Amino acid sequence: METRYNPHAIEPRRQKQWEEAPHLAMDGRPKFYALSMFPYPSGALHMGHVRNYSITDVISRYKRMRGFNVLHPIGWDAFGLPAENAAIDRGIHPAQWTEQNIAQMREQLKRLGFAYAWEREVATCSPAYYRWTQKLFLEFWKAGLAYRKAGVVNWDPVDQTVLANEQVDAEGRSWRSGALVEKRPLEQWYLKITDYAEELLQALGTLGDWPERVRVMQENWIGKSVGAELCFPINGEPEGIRVFTTRPDTVYGVTYLVLAPEHPLVERITAPERREAVRAFVAQVQSESEIERVSEDRPKQGVSTGAVALNPFTGQAVPVWIADYVLFEYGTGAVMGVPGHDERDFVFASQYELPIRLVVQAPDGSLTEPLRAAYTEVGVLVNSGPFNGLDSPTGKLKIVEYAEQQGWGKGRVQYRLRDWLISRQRYWGCPIPMVYCPECGVVPVPDEQLPVALPGDVEFSGRGPSPLAKLEGWICVDCPQCGAPARRETDTMDTFIDSSWYFLRFADARNGAEPFSREAVDYWLPVDQYVGGIEHAILHLLYSRFFTKVLRDRGLLSFDEPFKRLLTQGMVLSNAFVDPATKKYYPPDQVEERGGAFFARPDGTPLVCAMEKMSKSKYNGIDPLTVRSEYGADTARLFVLFKAPPEKELEWSDADVRGQYSFLGRVWRTVYEFVSGEKPDRPVGEAQERDLRREVHRAIQQVGGDIEQYKFNTAIAALMKLNNAMADYPSGQSPAYKEGVYVIVKLLAPFAPHIGAELWQALGEAGDIHTSDWPALDESALVEETIVLVIQVNGKKRDDIQVPAAASEGELQELALASEAVRRHTDGKAIKKVIVVPGRLINLVVG
């Protein structure tokens, strides 16, 4: 055994050993499935990856040592726009670019010592994977959950192509051509996630081991609203204008209606003299993003259509407007304007001089007209015809009941959640396995013809239709149903489809006959521990839950939720240098520090140094492999686990990285001194042995408990404390010391696997430390013979003394009164009461 810790000698040797050893299943043991959200193969790991993957690696190694049959797989979320952009910019095929990146990142993961079941590795861009993605899509089709309808896309009028949202800048221009982007309708594919809205909402209550924050975010995204759908008649439109409202008790206060600019009624009902203004406004709104339109920080804009509808409750005419803040995809695409009792409506009505009516009086009767602000609370109905005097909740019920009787509306539950648009006008994605036949209509590709493979000979220009839409030879096929000439679907699927079921494929990754066997998923699923960023709290996690429920209903799964426990790790931050005036960021090598202030070189521009999320654009990223090359993989892993609790932000610190490297060196020294006999074997007493053994078993108790509770930082702190206790211990060969050496190596192994394996071998042990048993806790070793007792007199601390741990209350009182510091406050006074907090303090109440 070398005298000094040298990770550069240890780590390659251990990694080679692990790579050559088969990944053995441990049948007959309870299962544990640990999973980190699989990465997009960008080609380079960042510290956020290292933090995420270190967490599940610790958990999986720990669980294996605790006797579990562990599944800890990895794969690649490999479809997506960056590969297609690389094809355009660099002339390299997306498949080649992706494969190169996967190979590079696979090597990086191995160099960091992560214990993955590499034999289960998947890549979503592989036909062997997306064959089954297509098969599952067809399950949705058979269930009536996949359909086509017109949807709005971003259209680049110069390049004549559809753009993803991320390809449109803040000014609404194309990232490539610079043209102002237009909104255009296009037939696209959707999945009916709204059919599962209520179950997705209610089942959040069963996810007790998910962060509350994530559950609330999903609840808000689903956005359940209970209210009514009411119909306002309008000439020439048999169905009238349908609106949804959560406040039917305010219907007598409606002074206008607002349609979304995209609403199909707009063109039909607009008065001739208003058409030019309305069309101009619609065109203007189409260039705005949804986020801009609903932003609370910008003024609401609208224009009158010149049309008039009828409020059936009052018999009064109400003008019909269109406004940017109403979205066609939400509700009915129309809202009723009640400015007296809605803040947004109040602002809009004030801006356009529309009437404002009071129809809900405050309980104290304090409101008078004209209203100076919207009253949005519940109250008592006024100016509401036969419903006057009812409180708001009762008024809601009675008005909905009356509307149903009159045929003017009905009670309704609405969700903010919209059906999932999965069509992408892209090449590098999973082809949608559908064919369009002039005789049969939309026809699914039969199972035996799957996968519908992506053609390899494709031209990428970034202009015109999707590359697939240009390949007539690929598009033209025979109809699977009647044999007539037909055409393939040229859209590919949203990449969230791929990641909505990958955790199921890992259970049976080499199955060539089906996406997964029922036996495999029944054994491994649900995932016991899932780890990933909070940015996936809504879409990925919600879509995965949706997929699980649909596949359950199709008879493919037997469980309701995919992930039992969820941990969302915090971001990794590092110092970034920015010019506050221009918001320009500077690389560290262009920054100099003078007197605690920072300046740009060479012009001396004053800069601000702040901790920000690591990013290439901010020049503050830390390459994990740079840290590994200097300090080793174990140090990098230990740092990201120790620096902060996993759910909190982690601030990078070079000094703390060095601190973890030094700690590993000290543990190495502890084991070396034991193995070599360099530490003197001085005689020790039984009490000293008991004290050290207590420290050893405290560490066993704390490290195991802390891993279970994600407290990796305090677990590592407990290891540091134990190593310090052993370094200070006089005997280097006593039974307690020997036990401590073996224990600290085992406890360290899940966190720092390379040094753990090396030290295990140095101790003369055969086999892999990570398949050995976790140290057994001896509860009796934790019992203390003496404790430090705080003594209070009338609630104020007067002394602390060592007392036998098993002393009775009477004995504690005697010992307390024997203290000279205590007697100064009790002599000559009567003891009225004695309060004992076992193991902590005694309080003497005197008077």
From Swiss-Prot:
ATP binds at residue 616. It comes from Gloeobacter violaceus (strain ATCC 29082 / PCC 7421). Pfam families: Anticodon_1, tRNA-synt_1, tRNA-synt_1_2, tRNA-synt_1g. This is Leucine--tRNA ligase. Its EC number is 6.1.1.4. A motif ('HIGH' region) lies at residues 39-49. CDD domains: Anticodon_Ia_Leu_BEm (cd07958), LeuRS_core (cd00812). Keywords: Aminoacyl-tRNA synthetase, ATP-binding, Cytoplasm, Ligase, Nucleotide-binding, Protein biosynthesis. GO terms for biological process: leucyl-tRNA aminoacylation. Belongs to the class-I aminoacyl-tRNA synthetase family. Its main location: cytoplasm. SUPFAM superfamilies: Anticodon-binding domain of a subclass of class I aminoacyl-tRNA synthetases (SSF47323), Nucleotidylyl transferase (SSF52374), ValRS/IleRS/LeuRS editing domain (SSF50677). It is found in: Cytoplasm. It catalyses: tRNA(Leu) + L-leucine + ATP = L-leucyl-tRNA(Leu) + AMP + diphosphate.
